[in-house]
């Protein structure tokens, strides 16, 4: 239901701008005294065939009655330009008394004018809050009273002012709360407070009310009165008579009585229909939701033209669930269509805005647009902008009520001390200006306003548009355009106008013709009018109302085929007409309007003759295939990919044929292969439509039968995600042909693969240590690093050379720290650079040696620098003590193990492990270890555990390396000084070379200064042809 309401609201928004024949732009506005509630009730009044007025109730207006405050008025207003409103005097007396200082009645605040109805020259107006003091008790009772005016006199009609007093009788009747006239010259009065507020309907004949009136009689009994009687206590507080209407529901030609009972059935609400002959019950309609006030308003009219009266019931407090699932008060109108076979077909119409009180008032409008079906108005007096009020106009049709309003009237008055309540009262179905169309009055008592909307005469237009011929042969050039033969055709357009009601005899229309309408603005239109060489033509036409068709004919021509591409799409000839409203206005200033249910435009099509057989319909047979030599793409690499595409047409011509390549998000289009003579050089463009990336290539217009094209398209694939396993390209040929305009979709899929060149390398800094160390003395309990021995760093770098990234690598380091209970390399600390976490199987720096601050370049020593340093010293460069070199590694020494987990590493990135240690010099200074050379070796290995690409497999990737620090007993070689004679000889050679250079430059005039000429004749003359053979080529 919420979805239906939303769709109807959208429809309303669209149709509201399509103003139908109520003149909402120039309404007649009437204003009353501020605070008088002018507009609380409205009606039309026709005292004779030549007169028409508006009736407006103002129940809180002050009158000239003696000692009466806010007695209320009914005002009579002119509908034409003189919008003067004058009160009708129904009662000029003050309160009557039983005796002096013993009042009979209380007319102050009686709300006279709260209900008003008229029929011909008679007006019934009521004061439902009128009080009187009964003859037997001193209590005031709101029995209500009415006055019936017949043009010559006004008589009081107070059927509830009877001897049946108190709440259990008619003492709280509030007679006249709702009223109506029947066609049979009866009045119907609702009194919702009778019988403990069960409510009551009372009907009397107009003639008897007039005849039996006696100002001295307070309680009048009528012989032909029809009235409902009290029911059981279960019906208390039901409010029968809250709203009333009349209509024939028995088929006997006599109008029956309809009444809303909004609090009946435990507040579900009811509407009851009583027989117009004897007040017997005929039908009961029960609401479906508690407290919706079902029956707040009722109305009757034949909405579907089947000659059976239909019933409309308002429930302004009805709640429906919104899009969020919560209940919202939107209001509802029930449409009860009376069937010929008996019973009713019921439909529901929900409101569109919350708290708008949709259905508060319902008014039959008569046949507003003269289409043969009656229409209705439904008010939402607190809807719209700032709750100014809305009135929806619904049109009848053979199937019932059109659920989409044809017009929405909006209140234009801002709130004062209370909401404007525009639409609280409605009255239609009366032609106030005698133009053949019924009009509508809308009351807005919150701003003391009534508004008259007159219906505009509806013009029905019959239009015709013809094109001859409809098949345009570009080769048949029968017309001349500036001595050039062109292919031409004729455009004929006709208009005829008629309508009901008062319309001028001549109607002026502006007709607009447009050739090739479907081409967007700025595009080349393929056809032009011969006389103007333009695609559009305007014409003013005068049409006689009810006359014959008025026609005109124009020549148009087809442009040369070289001027446009689209030869397949039909050429649309479009005609639109508009009424000149200024020349059609009547004497009262009312404009007619075109029938909005008939489009004011039409179109025809012409086709260009194609080489497509006798039927002029081209049916191509399009095929596309694709291949590539590249079968695998490595993630992380900038992979060039060339697709070789074959496009064929084995059928008839394909117009505006294009190759569409859907580009996956992992790829970018580079261009077309142009360095291969075997491949066609297509014209291609990259486009994005609705977030779909595509390459569109032109294949010809037309792509003739038998065409076969071979082309190469270059892409770069480099934006793979972690979940991708392949890259897919979709290809299709599309044309503008009507039939068989698409080829089957071809696709090329290339698989993704992982490749990562991971390497590990290490370096020792320094790589040689020479013993003994000068001035070094061992300490039994070392406290600082220098107390232990010289610094030894091993640096390991794990580098990913790509192209693919990895997400997890395990690296294991083996470190020789003890041999035969002698400490070798004592690790002081280790540090990392990059996404790496490490743990060791033994405590680092267990002696808690104080760690010295690193030098500035100690940690940042690079591998390139380490490789280029002259650490490698051969044995012949050393004066070493002869002896074997003993290797101490994890094969013969105790090793500490460090395990590192390396995280995500992109191509070209590294993770580095810095191991800072001290050579335990005391070990090598022992006598048994002296005069020997040692090679201390640490090792590192890695294994790639995981890649971030979840759906791809990979091969085992691992490697290892060894870092060596050499310990040598001997004398460290010193660099030899350069001899003095070599230095002297080099200086002399440099001076000799400088002298030679100076001599050569002197000989060439380098040191000679060139001065500018002093005399005019010394200046060099400019030669005109010095720099070429003539200035004409410049």
From Swiss-Prot:
Signal peptide: 1-19
Cysteine-cysteine disulfides: 77-85, 126-146, 160-173, 479-488, 494-551, 612-618, 684-697, 838-900, 890-895
Extracellular face of the membrane: 20-978
Chain residue ranges for the region called Disordered: 1013-1034
Gene Ontology biological process terms in this record: angiogenesis; cell adhesion mediated by integrin; cell-cell adhesion; integrin-mediated signaling pathway
Short sequence motif GFFKR motif: positions: 1005-1009
Cellular component, GO, one term: integrin alphav-beta6 complex
Chain residues that bind Ca(2+) 2: 302, 304, 306, 308, 310
GO MF terms held by the record: integrin binding; metal ion binding
Glycosylation sites: 62, 278, 284, 540, 601, 690, 821, 837, 860, 931, 951, 959, 966
Main location class: membrane
Keywords assigned: Calcium, Cell adhesion, Cell junction, Cleavage on pair of basic residues, Disulfide bond, Glycoprotein, Integrin, Membrane, Metal-binding, Receptor, Repeat, Signal, Transmembrane, Transmembrane helix
Pfam families associated with the record: FG-GAP, Integrin_A_Ig_1, Integrin_A_Ig_2, Integrin_A_Ig_3, Integrin_alpha
Residues exposed to the Cytoplasmic side: 1003-1034
InterPro entries in UniProt: FG-GAP (IPR013517), Int_alpha_beta-p (IPR013519), Integrin_alpha (IPR000413), Integrin_alpha_C_CS (IPR018184), Integrin_alpha_Ig-like_1 (IPR013649), Integrin_alpha_Ig-like_2 (IPR048285), Integrin_alpha_Ig-like_3 (IPR048286), Integrin_alpha_N (IPR028994)
Basic and acidic residues: bias regions: 1013-1028
UniProt entry tagged with the keyword Coiled coil: no
Assembly and oligomerization: Heterodimer of an alpha and a beta subunit. The alpha subunit is composed of a heavy and a light chain linked by a disulfide bond. Alpha-V (ITGAV) associates with either beta-1 (ITGB1), beta-3 (ITGB3), beta-5 (ITGB5), beta-6 (ITGB6) or beta-8 (ITGB8). Interacts with RAB25. Interacts with CIB1. Integrins ITGAV:ITGB3 and ITGAV:ITGB5 interact with FBLN5 (via N-terminus). ITGAV:ITGB3 and ITGAV:ITGB5 interact with CCN3. ITGAV:ITGB3 interacts with ADGRA2. ITGAV:ITGB3 interacts with FGF2; it is likely that FGF2 can simultaneously bind ITGAV:ITGB3 and FGF receptors.
Record-given protein name: Integrin alpha-V
Organism name: Gallus gallus (Chicken)
